[in-house]
């Protein structure tokens, strides 16, 4: 890491540590009280800081499912340690509203590739999260340690990204941050943090999510939301250490960071507008826009349509090559008595495939194994999801259970190398079953299965994942 990056990290770390000292010295009545951590604090925090953005939630996007992990119940220590809850009420707010959360995850991954090689591992781990209360209703700190430990990891079948390559454990301090806020207008976060903004996101599809080093400021100004940031480094899901943003993008030797800008709005009920830009000096720029509209036609029947557009091109010294590409996608669907169904189409310019080194592709046709975003590719997909808990189409209910089926195919893709040859047709079918077990709050079981015909290959790709999440509030 270059000198400038090291100095920035030291400054942000000093701010985090300084907050610990200040937190002890402020009296208990010095700020507006948050909700007691004996109940979920997410609601109270979102009312005072811009944590909820006016853009589509992933689980509402039919063809890009991301089922939320349920939150756990009352914190264990406050429930079972006599007098602890009452004692903490008398502490300064910085300590009184402290939360500690343990998230356990078990993940089994098995994929048979078209060349008959195999990727297989079973890992156990998760993360431990600390978050302070607000000091003077303005400042707080937090940190998250992540781990992934191999339970079964054959040496001859690496490549799952559950573990550090080839099959080694992961132990890392993925988040360590300080935050300043002013009402809902501004929330400044410095140092190691989560970022979830279109092409820069968590990519939380294995044991450990992507986390970033940098500074961001986001907020809400009336109907508008914004986020502006400068990100210097990224820790990928299979890594323990952070690497320069430009290096992750392929520009080795460059210390350029990523400038993130986002503007979103909800001008009328049901209409969500989202636009973002991601710029890396001398590497490339990505501009992304997403419009979603959801409208209830009659009771229990809603229609939903969406449009996405991406412009991506090299800039400056073209450190990763001179290229430009565009992509466009649209989708439509309906929600009726617990059933969600619809279709999407996507087309990508022949200039280049989309580059997505900072997370998963946010497109409608991002599937379990394949992203249908190759150069020149034209793709379409259909899907249906049913909520067995809230749905009323069937004569029975299974609380917490959702099932998703989806199918997509992509054609006309081309190699952008010297040959410019045609690439084979790709088809994928997915089954995704998620069960938020109702009698154990915070416990989720998920099964994901994919079948991929990679065009012209004798052996299809077969992959399945078994995932267990258990969220346990500790304090």
Task: Indicate residue ranges for each PLM-predicted region.
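Residues that define the transmembrane beta-barrel architecture of outer-membrane proteins
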Residues: 96, 120-124, 170-174, 209-213, ...
């Amino acid at each position: 890491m270059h000198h400038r990056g090291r100095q920035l990290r030291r400054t942000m770390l000093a701010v985090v540590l300084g907050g610990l000292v200040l937190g002890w010295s402020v009296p208990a009545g010095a700020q507006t009280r948050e909700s007691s951590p004996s109940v979920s604090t997410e609601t109270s925090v979102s009312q005072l800081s811009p944590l909820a953005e006016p853009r589509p939630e992933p689980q509402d996007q039919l063809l890009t499912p991301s089922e939320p992990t349920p939150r756990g119940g009352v914190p264990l220590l406050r429930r079972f340690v006599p007098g602890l809850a009452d004692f903490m009420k008398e502490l300064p707010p910085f300590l009184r509203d402290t939360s500690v959360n343990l998230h356990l995850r078990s993940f089994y991954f098995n994929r048979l590739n078209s060349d008959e090689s195999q990727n297989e591992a079973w890992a156990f781990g998760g993360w431990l999260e600390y978050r302070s209360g607000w000091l003077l209703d303005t400042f707080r700190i937090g940190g998250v340690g992540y781990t992934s430990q191999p339970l079964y990891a054959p040496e001859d079948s690496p490549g799952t990204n559950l573990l550090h390559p080839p099959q080694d454990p992961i132990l890392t301090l993925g988040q360590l941050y300080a935050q300043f806020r002013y009402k809902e207008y501004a929330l400044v976060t410095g140092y190691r943090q989560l970022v979830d903004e279109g092409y820069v996101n968590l990519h939380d599809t294995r044991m450990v999510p992507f986390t970033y080093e940098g500074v961001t400021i986001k907020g809400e100004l009336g109907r508008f939301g914004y986020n502006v940031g400068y990100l210097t480094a990224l820790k990928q899901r299979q890594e323990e250490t952070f690497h320069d943003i430009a290096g992750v993008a392929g520009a080795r030797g460059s210390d350029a960071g990523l400038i993130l800008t986002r503007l979103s709005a909800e001008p009328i009920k049901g209409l969500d507008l989202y636009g973002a830009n991601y710029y890396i000096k001398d590497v490339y720029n990505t501009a992304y826009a997403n419009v979603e509209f959801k409208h209830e036609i009659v009771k229990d029947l809603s229609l939903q349509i969406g449009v996405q557009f991406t412009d991506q091109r090299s800039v400056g010294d073209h450190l990763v090559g001179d290229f430009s590409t565009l992509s466009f996608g649209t989708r439509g669907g309906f929600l009726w008595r617990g059933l969600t169904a619809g279709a999407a189409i996507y087309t990508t310019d022949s200039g280049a495939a989309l580059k997505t080194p900072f997370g998963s592709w946010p497109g409608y046709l991002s599937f379990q194994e394949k992203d249908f975003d190759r150069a020149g590719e034209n793709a379409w997909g259909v899907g249906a999801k049913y909520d067995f808990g809230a749905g009323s189409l069937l004569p029975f209910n299974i609380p917490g259970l959702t099932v998703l089926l989806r199918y997509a195919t992509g054609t006309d893709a081309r190699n952008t190398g010297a040959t410019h040859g045609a690439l084979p047709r790709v088809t994928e079918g997915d089954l995704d079953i998620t069960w938020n077990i109702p009698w154990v709050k915070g416990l989720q079981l998920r099964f994901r299965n994919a079948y991929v015909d990679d065009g012209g290959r004798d052996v299809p790709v077969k992959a399945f994942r078994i995932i267990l999440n258990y969220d346990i509030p500790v304090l």
